[in-house]
Amino acid sequence: MGKLNDREIASLLSEPIISFITTLNRDGSPHTSPVWHMAQDGKVIVATGSSTVKSNNIAKDPRVSLVAAAGRSPQPWVQINGKAVVSKPE
């Protein structure tokens, strides 16, 4: 599958699929977890508990990578690298 355009990325991120988020452990090694995501206002939101490994890792080092891939063929996927913020629900 070739590179996705912005519309295809938005469509993929709106699907109810499991994504994988990678955070960095204290020693710099990767920690990858399956998560549900929601795309909203140009951001990707992931729900997790405040005491999870990923929350603790993000508090120490906000760099993350999220991969969302649909379970069909050809398999569209997107990888988003950036910085995460841990926040409490409003």
How would you describe each model-predicted region?
Residues M1-I18, P74:
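Extreme N-terminal tail/first-helix region
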Residues L13-N25, V64-L66:
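A short, Trp-centered hydrophobic/proline-enriched beta-strand micro-motif
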Residues N25-D27, A39:
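Short, acidic, Ser/Thr-enriched surface-loop or helix-capping motifs
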Residues S51-E90:
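Short, structured beta-strand-loop surface elements
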